[in-house]
């Protein structure tokens, strides 16, 4: 969140503890150091650290000490927004929660980014990480291929959902403060952000009793959609047909216009019911083309591909 705010021109100060620095400093991801060399100041060289902390100033404060907390309060007194991602007990334990920060600066905006929010629920005190969140709010259940076990997303996207939520909330809070002179406490729960991303599955479960299913790269009503082999070893192309007109265009491009009249594939319901057979037809065709050549051919016909 802070990196995006810095991109927009905000002065952002990142605070780290002397014994608990930012975990992305260690360059644990393969290849995260320039030229794969740690260098003498390796703690400042990790690409992940520099990406997430771009545009920020750095400050070390030991908030477990009285002196550290006093310095933090001085910083709060001249700040517009404070962001923290501790579990709920931490800021309360330091007397740095919203009621106490308001005493220092009445119009302060506090952003608390936790796993499950600051409510009274049984999960409230639980720490969180994006991968575990995917399992808790149900995303893993609908990710993966039919007949296989649940899977996580390729990247840990829940962190970014809470980031974007925070950015919009901060903008709204600043606007509100400019009109009313009042600050706000923005309580973001990663769980809520992730559950929002599954809203159609949740509504389907509530309304129809369906639990959702794993369908890999397929889509329930954009058919065909998938990642198909192209010519060459381990070369692939994705395409997504969103209407009967796009399906007709694809059939013509494949040189098989009769497929559009085939009762197995003539409309989206038929194509859904015969998805396996359809995938075989598409796969046999795509694997005869270079992936880039085929992408341009499909795009020229108005069919999303990449």
Where are these regions (language model features)?
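N-terminal helix-loop segment corresponding to the beta1-alpha1 unit
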Residues: 1-179
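Glycine-rich beta-alpha junction loops
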Residues: 19, 115-117, 190-195, 232, ...
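Short Pro/Gly-enriched beta-strand edge/turn motifs at strand-loop
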Residues: 30-36, 206-213
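Short Gly/Pro-enriched turn/cap motifs at secondary-structure boundaries
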Residues: 39-41, 49, 213-220, 226-227, ...
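Conserved Rossmann-fold dehydrogenase catalytic segment
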Residues: 118-119, 147-156, 178-194, 210-220, ...
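Conserved active-site and cofactor/substrate-binding residues in soluble primary-metabolism enzymes
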Residues: 131-134, 161-168, 219, 241-245, ...
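Oxidoreductase and adenylate-handling cofactor-binding alpha/beta cores
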Residues: 144, 163-183, 196-208, 251-258
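Aromatic-enriched alpha-helical interface/lid elements that frame and gate functional surfaces
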Residues: 224-305
């Amino acid at each position: 969140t802070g990196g995006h705010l810095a991109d927009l021109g905000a002065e952002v100060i990142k605070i780290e503890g002397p014994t608990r620095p930012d975990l992305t400093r260690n360059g644990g991801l393969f290849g995260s150091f320039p030229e794969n060399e740690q260098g003498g100041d390796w703690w400042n060289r990790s690409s992940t650290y520099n990406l997430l902390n771009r545009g920020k100033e750095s400050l070390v404060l030991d908030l477990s000490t009285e002196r550290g907390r006093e310095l933090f309060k001085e910083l709060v007194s001249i700040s517009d927004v404070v962001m923290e991602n501790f579990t709920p007990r931490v800021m309360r334990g330091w007397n740095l929660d919203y009621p106490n920060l308001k005493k220092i600066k009445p119009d302060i905006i506090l952003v608390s980014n936790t796993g499950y929010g600051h409510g009274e629920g049984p999960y409230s005190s639980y720490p969180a990480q994006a991968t575990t969140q995917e399992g808790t709010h149900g995303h893993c259940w609908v990710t993966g291929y039919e007949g296989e076990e649940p899977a996580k997303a390729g990247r840990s996207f829940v962190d970014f959902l809470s980031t974007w939520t925070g950015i919009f909330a901060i903008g709204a809070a600043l606007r509100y403060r400019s009109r009313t002179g009042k600050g706000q406490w923005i309580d973001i729960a990663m769980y809520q952000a992730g559950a929002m991303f599954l809203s159609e599955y949740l509504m389907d479960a509530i309304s129809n009793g369906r639990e959702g299913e794993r369908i890999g790269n397929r889509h329930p009503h954009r058919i065909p959609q998938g990642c198909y082999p192209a010519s060459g070893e381990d070369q692939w192309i994705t395409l997504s047909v969103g209407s009967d007109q796009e399906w007709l265009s694809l059939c013509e491009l494949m040189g098989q216009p009769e497929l559009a009249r085939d009762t197995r594939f003539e409309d989206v319901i038929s194509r859904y019911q015969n998805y396996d057979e359809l995938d075989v037809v598409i796969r046999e065709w795509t694997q005869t083309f270079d992936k880039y050549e085929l992408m341009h051919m499909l795009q020229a016909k108005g069919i999303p591909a990449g």
